[in-house]
């Protein structure tokens, strides 16, 4: 086992590693260790001998660097590449030179190692040897010099015996003899062995560090591939031709020279005199191209003829076949003036040849990678060759790509390179397809890809995700090729080279067929007549280049050139006039229409060049080429015809005379039409006025040249008749082409302008019609009157609409929104406004519309305002966090003080209107009284039936259910502490099909529920909504706030307006006030108010309609018991009467200090007798007067609102309103079970028309955790009322201790129950499943619900006498929460009430229920104890219900 010597100096590179334990990793490990035996075993297993590590280093590089001689021999024998490039460009030859071991370097040189290669820093192996230290580098440098000297001697013509004696670098190791004495080398390298010249074999191939070569039979030193190696003196400049050089890429230059009397083109590196060291690496490109060109043979690849080495062997030049024209890039962009006409069949023929060369490369496993117009060389007329193979990569069997130079593509070629090549990723066959497609676009549009953008900018653009696109000006078959070929992703480049070649070949056949049948015409307006002389199609003769009349061709070419052409600036200065010159007959025969071109057209063309317009840019150069080539062919045909009839020119003149007037007439007609079209185009729009003026001037200049043949006709003796005709025809063709392009552009402009005008007119009409419909609707709404109720309600009963007269419009003018509600509106609104845009407009029916003020009518961006979120106080707008309880309470009281005065000002007007509407029919009153009496009797006997909660049982709406689709559920808005539901009011429509496409802010439409039960989810989420309606008022306003109780959170009711433009908003309002037959409309109006960033909504709440299409789900936080409580409330009795209040009643502000219950009990065991009702009426009048409405303004909505708020409140004139108050009283007096209370919701809202009772709600520490009540709320509320209640009795404190012991055992069950009742996403899904199961049997009661109902009935039985007492002593109850009334009376009344309630509850509780619900029963009893919560400071589970009524004396 050989060991490498340690490095005395730092190594130029770091050795790479492996991240896994593969065979390749073991190979490198054994190479480091120098273990030859194990290395052979690994190689015999078939591992890749050139496997690389993380630095791109092969095992041979590692072994050579560490000086393992035996391992180097083994790896070379197994075929390892001595010129393998690492990631830094170094090779094993560099490593061997650094190691200082001459035997290792000689072995690598014999295997083909090259001493001329450089790393990325420009260092060759000799430079690496010098870095190893003087002791080790001296002998190594001398060895490399001996190899160089020996190679020079062989090239300079030393005798064959010299190569015969020293045939291997190993013979040069040690003290070098001067080509005489020999040093014994390898036993296999015998100097006496016989060489067989002319036979290429392993023994006849030599290598001394300058490439492998062999001797031919003529004793010619030849590289493999039979490439002669010549000296630099053998290639010289020809005497009969000028020097001609051109660039063949960013670093290479090609020069036409002569070698051995053969005209060749020599390619060499173009470097400055003193290049930077990194530039020295570019010399490797020629070596790589030499290697590839010597191994590849194809007719369309540029043929490499010889390799020229300099005397010092530092420079290398490649000798290729003669290139006559140059690169395609130079023809298209650098010397285009010399080649004004490129025939289409020539272009296609060139592209076919390039495609064939690429197909050959791909078949050999090579990828060009640097294909561009620089790589395409036009060697002769119509003959192209592909070259520039220095960046060629080879695909190996393993799938990897071998890059000889490992040099990145230069930035100058990024304009043609595929995105993966630019980003230095692996190139594939489709990378060459991309570059070939770019060349097709370049040659047909005369524009450099990426508009000549710098390569570095191209890379940045591609990195940002921008890619090259196909030019729309390309002809049809080529546009498809380019569009598919230059796609950014390789997988989308579906067209391969064989397909492209097939399309090009068929297109070329069509060209040739069109040329034979119609020599003067073609599908593209150009001639394809073959020219025997290449000068006609490529303009190569010197006479053609020196011809002054050719300037007009240059000018014609410049008209169509692209603005980014690199040579545009050189053609902008041309002479305005050209003097007529006498041309040779040969030139006249070739260019007949150039001989007699008058000076005015040239001046006209020069003027056009000096003032280009947008229309000129549209004329690309290949279109001008087609036009002009057609003129050339036409002139040639005319010349031949003229020469054929030269014997009788007299007979030919009449035909010419007839032809000229006809041409003049056609041209005059075309001129008039163009001028008329331009004048018409100018009158359409003023947007493109300047551009049209420029186009019109350009047309005038172009057409002005058509009138110039007048002096030509006068000078008939100077010109022949055929030249005049040809002049007319050429001008006609040119102007016709220009006119066609301008016509197309003008037509496109006209079409766009007409569309814009139509859109504006349509929008104006829609705006006018919708404004008129809005005014008509307002008049209809103002005159709408509804009759009072005439009978008891049914399940489908709808309360009538109340209207308020005399309310003025807002100051901003027209920013109120009027909405209507009818059966099924929630479902229709869900279906219509969560679905697609309406396909037709409804003639009648309610449609949402956005408020539009006159100032912002035209601004559609401001029409996306949403209706204000209807919230209770204490809740911020969507997305905002809950404020602190102290801030919420202060804001609530502040809003109450601000609004109480405005409410009182409106109350008398409301009452007067309502009293006028109470003149009911006597028969109707009789029916109502009978119904009330019957209902009361049922209530007394306990037989008052529960209305079914499932609206599907309602018969009147079954037909409507069939025609309506399933609505979408309301998406929740999740706050920090509670989950709020958005409630959307729907608008009544005449037809049942969904209308309108309304986009709602912050709405999620993805959770569409396709089940039928989801129709009711929306309404059930209206948390305690009531609908009192007002009649005969012009502008009813809807001011809604959500009710909240200790068991449910504040329901967030959010009204969304459409986010569509103004047209869509107004069209949904057309005929929106039409009434639906069989139903009564309910009208609401949302008013926007601004007041200290608070959303203030006065609240006559909505009464939930118990019908099939209107009823929807309550909030998910409500339990089944609460659902039943709503359905079994006293609203059935409330709807059955019409008893008025006194007119002198008024409203008075009352501050609520405790959260309220918002639902009435399920049933009442104590019915209301006529006496109790009449006695309660006076109390409730003052209760309603003292009601205040606490609303909060959402800060996220900014409407054109008014500064002051109009507070709308009403005195309810029926038993329905009084019963509603009773309902809230019962709900306040009832002690709900703790497990059904969801204290997570914030409950600090007031309720209008329901009750003025404020419930102080207290929970213990355990109850707070169980119910998720925010502790801040509890502390804030307790501190507020801490000093208002008397101290607790001693007996209550004793019972508290007993209560604590009972709660220990029942705490776990309560926590589980509260957790089940929390509003979570899992609960939402569970509730929806329950709704689905109950939609068939119309039942939603489970075993838990039955138990809850029993608890509720038991609670109601204890409140009978309390209710009567509360109704008879409102003053005392009011004083309970009024701190100004004195604490003595408050303490007395509360102590008496609590003792009485406690006694009655103990008697009513059943013995068997006491054991199972001991903790709950204790809670119900202790919560009514007067003052124990004050001492405990909310630390114990308790709940005090304080009943508050207005003072009648006030």
From Swiss-Prot:
Chain span(s) of sequence motif GPPX3Y: 791-797
Expression across tissues is: Detected in testis and spermatogonia. Not detectable in the other tissues tested.
**Record's function text:** Required both for the formation of intercellular bridges during meiosis and for kinetochore-microtubule attachment during mitosis. Intercellular bridges are evolutionarily conserved structures that connect differentiating germ cells and are required for spermatogenesis and male fertility. Acts by promoting the conversion of midbodies into intercellular bridges via its interaction with CEP55: interaction with CEP55 inhibits the interaction between CEP55 and PDCD6IP/ALIX and TSG101, blocking cell abscission and leading to transform midbodies into intercellular bridges.
Q: Where is the composition biased (Polar residues)?
A: 875-886, 894-906, 1038-1061, 1300-1311, 1332-1344
Q: Which SUPFAM superfamilies match?
A: Ankyrin repeat (SSF48403), Protein kinase-like (PK-like) (SSF56112)
Q: Where in the cell is it found?
A: Cytoplasm; Midbody; Chromosome, Centromere, Kinetochore
User: In the UniProt record, what gene is named as encoding this protein?
Assistant: Tex14
Explain what the UniProt record notes about the effect of disrupting the gene for this protein: Male mice are sterile, due to the absence of intercellular bridges. Intercellular bridges do not form during spermatogenesis, and male mice are sterile. In females, embryonic intercellular bridges are also absent, mice have fewer oocytes, but they are fertile.
Assembly, in brief, is: Interacts with KIF23 and RBM44. Interacts with CEP55; inhibiting interaction between CEP55 and PDCD6IP/ALIX and TSG101.
* Listed Pfam families: Ank_2 (PF12796), PK_Tyr_Ser-Thr (PF07714)
Give the comment on domains: The protein kinase domain is predicted to be catalytically inactive. The GPPX3Y motif mediates interaction with CEP55.
Q: What is this protein called?
A: Inactive serine/threonine-protein kinase TEX14
Q: Does the keyword Cell division apply?
A: yes
Q: At the top level of its lineage, which domain of life is listed?
A: Eukaryota
UniProt source species: Mus musculus (Mouse)
Q: Where is this region: Disordered?
A: 700-720, 852-906, 947-977, 992-1012, 1035-1062, 1261-1282, 1300-1418
């Amino acid at each position: 086992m050989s060991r490498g010597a340690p490095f005395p100096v730092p190594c130029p590179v770091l050795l790479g590693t492996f991240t896994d334990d593969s065979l390749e990793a073991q190979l490198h490990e054994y190479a480091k260790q120098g273990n030859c035996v194990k290395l052979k075993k690994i190689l015999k297993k078939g591992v890749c001998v050139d496997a690389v590590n993380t630095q791109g280093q092969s095992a041979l590089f590692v072994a050579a660097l560490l000086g393992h001689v035996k391992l180097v021999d083994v790896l070379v024998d197994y075929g390892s590449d001595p010129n393998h490039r690492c990631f830094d460009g170094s090779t094993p030859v560099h490593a061997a030179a650094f190691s200082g071991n001459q035997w290792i370097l000689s072995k690598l040189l014999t295997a083909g190692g090259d001493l001329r290669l450089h790393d990325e820093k420009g260092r060759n192996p000799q430079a690496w040897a010098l870095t190893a230290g003087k002791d080790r580098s001296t002998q190594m440098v001398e060895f490399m010099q001996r190899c160089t000297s020996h190679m020079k001697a062989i090239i300079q013509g030393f005798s064959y015996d010299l190569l015969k004696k020293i045939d291997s670098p190993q013979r040069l190791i040690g003290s070098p003899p001067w080509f005489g004495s020999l040093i014994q080398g390898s036993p296999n390298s015998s100097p006496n062995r016989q060489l067989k010249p002319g036979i290429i074999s392993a023994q006849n191939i030599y290598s001394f560090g300058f490439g492998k070569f062999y001797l031919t039979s003529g004793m010619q030193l030849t590289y493999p591939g039979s490439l002669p190696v010549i000296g630099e003196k053998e290639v010289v400049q020809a005497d009969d031709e000028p020097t001609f050089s051109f660039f063949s890429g960013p670093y290479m230059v090609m020069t036409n020279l002569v070698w051995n009397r053969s005209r060749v083109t020599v390619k060499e590196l173009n470097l400055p005199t003193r290049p930077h060291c990194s530039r020295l690496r570019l010399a490797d490109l020629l070596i790589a191209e030499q290697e590839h060109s010597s191994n590849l043979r194809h007719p369309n690849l540029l043929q490499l003829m010889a390799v020229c080495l300099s005397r010092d062997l530092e420079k290398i030049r490649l000798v290729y076949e003669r290139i006559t024209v140059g690169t395609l890039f130079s023809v298209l962009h650098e010397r285009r003036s010399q080649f004004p006409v490129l025939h289409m069949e020539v272009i296609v023929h060139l592209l076919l040849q390039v495609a064939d060369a690429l197909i050959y490369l791909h078949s050999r496993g090579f990828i060009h990678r640097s294909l561009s117009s620089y790589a395409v060389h036009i060697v002769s007329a119509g003959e192209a060759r592909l070259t520039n193979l220095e960046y060629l990569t080879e695909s190996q069997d393993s799938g990897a790509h071998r890059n000889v130079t490992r040099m990145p593509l230069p930035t100058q070629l990024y304009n043609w390179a595929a995105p993966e090549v630019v980003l230095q990723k692996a190139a594939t066959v489709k990378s060459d397809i991309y570059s070939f497609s770019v060349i097709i676009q370049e040659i047909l549009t005369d524009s450099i890809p990426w508009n000549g953008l710098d390569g570095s900018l191209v890379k940045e653009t591609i990195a940002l995700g921008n890619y090259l696109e196909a030019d729309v000006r390309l002809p049809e078959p080529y546009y498809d090729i380019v569009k598919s070929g230059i796609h950014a992703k390789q997988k989308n480049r579906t067209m391969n080279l064989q397909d492209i070649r097939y399309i090009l070949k068929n297109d070329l056949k069509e060209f040739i067929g069109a040329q034979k049948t119609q020599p003067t015409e073609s599908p593209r307006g150009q001639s394809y007549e073959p020219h025997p002389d290449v000068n006609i199609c490529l303009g190569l003769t010197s006479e053609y280049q020196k011809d002054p009349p050719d300037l007009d061709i240059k000018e014609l070419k410049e008209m169509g050139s692209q603005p980014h052409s690199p040579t545009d600036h050189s053609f902008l200065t041309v002479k305005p006039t050209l003097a007529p010159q006498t041309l040779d007959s040969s030139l006249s025969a070739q260019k007949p229409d150039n001989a007699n071109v008058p000076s005015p057209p040239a001046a006209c063309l020069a003027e056009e060049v000096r003032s280009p317009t947008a229309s000129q840019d549209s004329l690309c150069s290949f279109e001008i080429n087609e036009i002009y080539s057609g003129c050339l062919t036409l002139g040639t045909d005319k010349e031949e015809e003229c020469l054929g009839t030269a014997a009788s020119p007299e007979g030919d003149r009449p035909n010419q005379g007839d032809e000229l007037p006809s041409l003049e007439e056609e041209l005059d007609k075309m001129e008039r039409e163009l001028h008329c079209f331009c004048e018409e185009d100018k009158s359409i729009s003023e947007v493109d006025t300047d551009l049209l003026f420029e186009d019109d001037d350009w047309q005038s200049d172009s057409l002005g040249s058509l009138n110039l043949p007048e002096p030509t006709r006068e000078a008939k003796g100077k010109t022949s008749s055929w030249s005049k005709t040809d002049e007319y025809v050429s001008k006609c063709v040119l102007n016709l082409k220009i006119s066609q392009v301008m016509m197309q552009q003008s037509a496109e402009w006209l079409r766009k302008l007409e569309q814009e005008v139509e859109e504006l007119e349509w929008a104006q009409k829609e705006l006018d019609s919708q404004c008129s419909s809005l005014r008509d609707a307002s008049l209809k709404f103002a005159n709408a009157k509804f009759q009072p109720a005439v009978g008891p309600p049914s399940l489908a009963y709808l309360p009538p609409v109340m209207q308020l007269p005399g309310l003025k419009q807002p100051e901003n003018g027209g920013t109120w929104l009027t909405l209507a509600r009818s059966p099924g509106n929630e479902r229709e609104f869900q279906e219509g406004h969560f679905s697609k845009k309406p396909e037709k407009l409804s003639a009648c029916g309610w449609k949402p519309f956005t408020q539009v003020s006159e100032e912002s009518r035209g601004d559609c961006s401001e029409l996306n305002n949403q209706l204000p979120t209807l919230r209770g106080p204490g809740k911020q707008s969507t997305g905002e966090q809950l404020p602190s309880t102290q801030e919420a309470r202060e804001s609530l009281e502040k809003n109450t003080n601000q609004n109480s005065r405005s409410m009182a000002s409106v109350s008398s007007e409301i009452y007067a209107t309502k009293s006028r509407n109470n003149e009911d029919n006597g028969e109707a009153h009789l029916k109502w009284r009978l119904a009330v009496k019957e209902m009361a009797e049922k209530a007394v006997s306990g037989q008052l039936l529960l209305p079914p909660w499932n609206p599907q049982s309602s018969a009147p709406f079954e037909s409507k259910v069939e025609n309506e689709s399933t609505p979408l559920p309301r998406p929740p808005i999740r706050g920090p502490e509670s989950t709020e539901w958005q409630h959307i009011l729907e608008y009544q429509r005449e037809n049942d099909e969904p209308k309108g496409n309304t986009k709602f802010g912050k709405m999620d439409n993805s959770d569409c529920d396709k089940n039928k039960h989801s129709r009711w989810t929306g309404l059930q989420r209206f948390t305690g909504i009531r609908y009192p309606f007002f009649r005969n008022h012009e502008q009813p306003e809807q001011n809604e706030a959500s009710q909240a109780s200790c068991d449910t959170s504040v329901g967030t009711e959010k009204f969304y307006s459409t986010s569509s433009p103004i047209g869509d908003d107004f069209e949904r309002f057309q005929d929106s006030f039409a009434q639906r037959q069989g139903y009564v409309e309910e009208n609401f109006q949302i008013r926007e108010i601004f007041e200290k960033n608070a959303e203030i909504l006065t609240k006559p709440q909505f009464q939930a309609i118990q019908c099939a299409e209107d009823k929807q789900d309550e909030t998910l936080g409500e339990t089944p018991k609460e659902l039943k409580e709503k359905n079994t409330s006293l609203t059935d009795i409330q709807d059955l009467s019409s008893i008025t209040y006194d007119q002198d009643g008024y409203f008075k502000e009352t501050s609520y200090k405790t959260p309220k219950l918002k639902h009435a009990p399920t049933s009442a065991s104590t019915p209301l007798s006529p006496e109790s009702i009449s006695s309660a009426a006076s109390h409730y009048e003052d209760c309603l007067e003292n009601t205040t409405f606490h609303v909060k303004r959402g800060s996220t909505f900014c409407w054109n609102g008014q500064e002051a708020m109009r507070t709308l409140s009403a005195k309810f004139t029926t038993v329905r309103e009084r019963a509603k108050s009773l309902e809230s009283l019962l709900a306040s007096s009832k002690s709900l079970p703790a497990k059904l209370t969801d204290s997570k919701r914030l409950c600090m809202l007031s309720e209008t028309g329901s009750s003025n009772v404020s419930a102080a709600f207290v929970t213990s520490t355990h109850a707070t955790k169980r119910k998720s009540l925010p502790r801040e709320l509890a502390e804030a509320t307790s501190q507020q009322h801490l000093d208002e209640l008397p101290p607790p009795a001693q007996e209550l404190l004793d019972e508290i201790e007993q209560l604590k012991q009972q709660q220990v055992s029942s705490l776990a069950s309560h926590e589980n129950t509260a957790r089940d009742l929390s509003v979570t996403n899992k609960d939402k899904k569970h509730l929806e499943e329950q709704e689905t199961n109950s939609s068939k049997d119309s039942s939603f009661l489970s075993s838990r619900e039955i138990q809850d109902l029993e608890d509720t009935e038991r609670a109601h039985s204890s409140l009978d006498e309390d209710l009567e007492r509360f109704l008879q002593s409102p003053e005392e109850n009011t004083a309970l929460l009024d701190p100004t009334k004195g604490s003595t009376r408050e303490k007395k009344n509360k102590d008496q009430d609590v003792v009485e309630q406690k006694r009655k509850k103990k008697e009513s509780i059943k013995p068997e229920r006491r054991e199972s619900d001991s903790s709950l029963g204790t809670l119900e009893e202790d919560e009514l104890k007067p003052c124990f919560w004050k001492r405990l400071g909310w630390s114990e589970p308790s709940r005090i219900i304080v009943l508050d009524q207005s003072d009648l004396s006030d």
